[in-house]
Amino acid sequence: MSVRAFYDDLAPRYHLVYEDWETSVARQGGALASLIAEHWGVNAHAVLDAALGIGTQALGLLARGFRVTGSDLSIGAVTRARREAVVRRLPLVSLVADFRALPVRSAAFDVVLLCDNSLPHLDSEADIQEALAECLRCVRRGGGCLISMRDYESPPPTGTVEVRPYGERLWAGRRYHLRQVWTWRGPRYDLSFEITPVDGAEAGG
C-alpha cells in the first residue's frame, strides 16, 4: 500500500491515535505558537503546514490567530482537515501536494511545519534533502522549518517484530483497541496500524 493510500484509508479514524484529539489540538497549538515566537518572533504568523494530515497542528495554530496554509499528499486527510476547520469556523487554506514539490511561491511563509514524523516516510537521503530544500524555498529570509520526528533508537535485527499498543479508545459509542506493528527490514520497517473493535467486528486499519 502506498503512503497516500494508507493515509486516505486512515483519515476518518486518525484522531484515534490520540487519547483525546481535541485536547491534543489545543496543546500542540500552544506549544507550536511558543516555539515559533521564541525562534522567529511574535510577528511570525504566516505558516505552511506541509504535512497537514487531518489538521492536528494547523487547527491549533488557526485558533490562536495564525494564518495557516495546509498541504498533504493524502486527499482523504486534506478533506477531513477542511471539514474540521469548517466545523470550527477557522479559515484554513488547503491543498493536496507532496512536500517535495509544493505549489506555492517562494518566500511566502514565516515558518514551514513538518510534524508527526512525516519526514521519515521518504525512502532515501536524497528525498529528504529534496523535501528540506523545498520547504526552505517557501520561507522568507529569517524564517525557518519546524520539524517533529520520532526519536528512533538503533534498528534491531532484520525480521524483528515490535508491537506498540495505543490502548483503548471510545468512538461513536464503540470501544476499539489500537496498536502499531513494526516489522523491521534493515534500517526501515513495514508498518501495520490495527484498529479493532472490542466486540471483534471489522473496522479496518
Regions found by a protein language model. Give the residues of each.
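Conserved class I S-adenosyl-L-methionine
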Residues: 1-53
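Class I SAM-dependent methyltransferase SAM/SAH-binding core
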Residues: 56-101
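A short acidic, Gly/Pro-enriched loop at the edge of an enzyme's catalytic core
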Residues: 103-111
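A short SAM/SAH-binding and catalytic strip from SAM-dependent methyltransferases
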Residues: 110-126
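A short glycine-rich, Lys/Arg-flanked "PGG" loop and its adjoining helix->strand segment in the class I
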Residues: 129-141
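Conserved beta-strand signature within the Rossmann-like core of class I S-adenosyl-L-methionine
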Residues: 142-149
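SAM-dependent methyltransferase
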Residues: 149-205
